[in-house]
């Protein structure tokens, strides 16, 4: 019979989380900032299953410091808000779709993609923390997949940023060419830049 305990890189044995994904009990043993990210993953999974966001937040925030609450709320709300585009970005970096039992991993990768795209967190820190969560939860065989997908997302973001051209003044002031021309004609010395 298969033993549910698995040896980690540090030599300690730990139980794999269920196929449905981690629970609050699974992430309690995770140390420091990784614990915050892992709890946000559990919150996201609960909300996706139909749980009340407010009830889940109240339960999770009992363990958070005020600083962790702000980070967790930004990460959770931003990831949920941008879930579909982030999910598409993650899926572009996968060779084949994840199985239905891997939805928790996809949610974790979406959290990582949100941090890479929208938060001011260094890419190496984001990738390392997401990979460490996978490893700590006992899924050593998925570490390479998580690392590769997040590095792919990082490369796609960098490529998209290189393609961006500087905006003309009428683009970021949300005014037409004609208005900009009139303003420039009448107030030539007052330049907006």
Describe the role of every protein-language-model region.
Residues 1-193:
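Class I Rossmann-like S-adenosyl-L-methionine
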């Amino acid at each position: 019979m298969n033993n549910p305990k698995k040896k980690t890189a540090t030599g300690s044995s730990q139980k794999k989380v269920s196929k449905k994904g981690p629970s609050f009990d699974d992430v309690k043993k995770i140390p420091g900032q990784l614990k915050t990210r892992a709890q946000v993953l559990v919150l996201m999974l609960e909300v996706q299953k139909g749980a009340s966001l407010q009830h889940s937040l109240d339960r999770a925030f009992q363990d958070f410091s005020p600083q962790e609450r702000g980070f967790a709320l930004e990460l959770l709300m931003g990831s949920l808000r941008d879930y579909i585009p982030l999910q598409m970005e993650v899926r572009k970096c996968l060779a084949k779709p994840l199985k239905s039992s891997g939805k928790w991993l996809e949610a974790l990768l979406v959290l990582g993609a949100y941090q890479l795209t929208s938060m001011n967190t260094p890419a190496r820190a984001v990738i390392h923390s997401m990979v460490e969560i996978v490893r700590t939860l006992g899924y050593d065989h998925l570490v390479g997949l998580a690392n590769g997908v997040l590095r792919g997302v990082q490369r796609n973001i960098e490529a998209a940023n290189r393609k961006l051209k500087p905006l003309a003044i009428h683009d970021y002031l949300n005014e037409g060419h004609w208005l900009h021309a009139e303003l420039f004609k009448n107030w030539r010395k007052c330049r907006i830049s």
